[in-house]
Amino acid sequence: MDKLLERFLHYVSLDTQSKSGVRQVPSTEGQWKLLRLLKQQLEEMGLVNITLSEKGTLMATLPANVEGDIPAIGFISHVDTSPDFSGKNVNPQIVENYRGGDIALGIGDEVLSPVMFPVLHQLLGQTLITTDGKTLLGADDKAGVAEIMTALAVLKGNPIPHGDIKVAFTPDEEVGKGAKHFDVEAFGAQWAYTVDGGGVGELEFENFNAASVNIKIVGNNVHPGTAKGVMVNALSLAARIHAEVPADEAPETTEGYEGFYHLASMKGTVDRAEMHYIIRDFDRKQFEARKRKMMEIAKKVGKGLHPDCYIELVIEDSYYNMREKVVEHPHILDIAQQAMRDCHITPEMKPIRGGTDGAQLSFMGLPCPNLFTGGYNYHGKHEFVTLEGMEKAVQVIVRIAELTAKRGQ
């Protein structure tokens, strides 16, 4: 389908891994390389109003080819890959007509197995694009990037009626910074879709409410031989804090609409310790209750400490559940579902146990649910995407554009 695979393989060859804890946006130079490449390709394709901001947001417009009061709609993907696993020297493997069983990843012992990933049973006969076991693939979200670019080429080269189509490619989504610098007014769409989901048919408009919790613990270190009544072990305090957190409300024990507390990192010595949690919940009241719970735990464990020893807790909200914004505009979901059905796809409405740029954008005035890309197992060496799934995503994007035009004519 019009260079879809070629585009995808080109994009994943560029190392665009983002980096957390960096002030600049984009956080890595590699993202600029892909953004500049996309800008050049958009220019060659004949799009207009192409801008690349100093914060690495690339925007462009495919002008309407029909008249009428047709709303401008947008499609958005991010160019960075996760910091969780290497994205350097990605070497994709193409497995045509998958016949089942294990797929060897490279020349080592790594395999992609239907025992661990049963979804493979549903993909027999399809073309799978996998890693070589040494890196992630980057389908999150270069599959989305390639799909949007291919959909633009299809719309540009065929007499398919559409209104103004706005596209944007953002940096640093994986570290939560991309959408913060997104100029919704300049984008000019009434609503948009991120193309950043998973398997074929996924349509997501609910995501976690999210917060980060940083805990600083200051103890008192003395020689252990003379420590009685004097030593305050910061690591012991950290252990007590974590013991108070509900063990059955962790990522590894929850699913669906269940929220969790997740101890993401902990480091320290007797003298000082730091803990970093993330809190997630779909329900706003439960989300607030989880934050209060963490404050109560810190207060309880810190009670009675010497004034020079203390526990300091800082909670920062990261993003909120976009459901409350998207459901105000039900036609956005109706059009996407109809587009999928028209492409012989059964829509699968499911909550995102995570977040997308669309969550932040929805609260910035741009309602923005999430469409599938055809990818699986993101952020690791078992990541893969199906060519057929990517082709379906292109078809759905094109059909959404066409259905929106019909509504406005």
Swiss-Prot record:
One of its GO terms (molecular function) is zinc ion binding. Zn(2+) 2 binds at D140, E174, H379. One of its GO terms (biological process) is peptide catabolic process. GO terms for cellular component: cytosol. InterPro entries: ArgE/DapE_CS (IPR001261), Bact_exopeptidase_dim_dom (IPR036264), Peptidase_M20 (IPR002933), Peptidase_M20_dimer (IPR011650), Peptidase_M20B (IPR010161). Its cofactor is Zn(2+). Its EC number is 3.4.11.4. The keyword Hydrolase applies. Zn(2+) 1 binds at H78, D140, D196. It is found in: Cytoplasm. The keyword Metal-binding applies. The active site is at D80, E173 (proton acceptor). Belongs to the peptidase M20B family. This is Peptidase T.
